[in-house]
């Protein structure tokens, strides 16, 4: 048994890999190939609307002394679903810290007020 965790930057790439997997045929006598499952989350592809929203967040961040850079991490969030629906979506606006989803995960407490202000001011600007 093999489990595949497929992550891709575009839906087109997901479809290309899925087609390749579906085309596979067993080569060993008596072997069988059964594919199950499917796309868990669509890729969060950048859109003009999301990039415009990021520009607004970046400007607000600069005024607060925060340096925001666009990034892609290849993970998954609920934002993947809203982005796939065409809703302008930003991810990563939460607290600053590290070691996400691990026992050693932490938040930099002195940064909480600025991160909170960033989100509040962005919402007020919408």
Model segments located where?
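Metal-dependent amide/peptide-bond hydrolase catalytic core
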Residues: 1-126
